[in-house]
Amino acid sequence: MFSVNVSDTPPEQRILGLDPGLGTMGFGCILAGSAGLKPVDYGVISTPSQHSMPERLQTLHEDLSQLLRQLRPHQVGLEKLFFYKMGNTIAIAQARGVILLTLAQHHLLPVEFTPAQVKQSLTGYGRADKQAVQAAVARELNLPSLPRPDDAADALAIAITVWHHRFS
């Protein structure tokens, strides 16, 4: 004979948001569960601009691998590629390729969102400015001030968006 414990509250989940970039990649990890959302860690992974492209991509891979081993996320959110300037877009696309490969090596399949989807999820307006999104992140995570740097704040916003869209 056995008993089954059925609970309406989901187990806590560590959700990692990633804001891709070659020079600076933002990351933000939250703990989500019945008690709400709590920040775990956030910051940036940087690659020196004076290094060659292969060296920068290797640094991104190694540092992200280490971060994944430390944080052990259950879910990952990733910003979809957004076109800025052609040169910048190519570098971000190369970084995204490394990010996707690194996630796959850690058996993680990211959920992807456009910047407008993230803004809509946090503020209710898909064209909200950076300040409004950062204020929403601070409010949702009960932070005493706006999260910095901007890339880390964006990554936290992506992680929160994963949580908001968990049943869609």
From Swiss-Prot:
The active site is at D19, E79, D151. GO terms for molecular function: crossover junction DNA endonuclease activity; DNA binding; magnesium ion binding. Its cofactor is Mg(2+). GO terms for cellular component: cytoplasm; Holliday junction resolvase complex. It is an enzyme of class 3 (hydrolase). It is found in: Cytoplasm. CDD domains: RuvC. The keyword Cytoplasm applies. The keyword Zinc does not apply. InterPro entries: RNaseH-like_sf, RNaseH_sf, X-over_junc_endoDNase_Mg_BS, X-over_junc_endoDNase_RuvC. Its EC number is 3.1.21.10. SUPFAM superfamilies: Ribonuclease H-like. Keywords: Cytoplasm, DNA damage, DNA recombination, DNA repair, DNA-binding, Endonuclease, Hydrolase, Magnesium, Metal-binding, Nuclease. Belongs to the RuvC family. This is Crossover junction endodeoxyribonuclease RuvC. It comes from Synechococcus sp. (strain JA-2-3B'a(2-13)) (Cyanobacteria bacterium Yellowstone B-Prime).
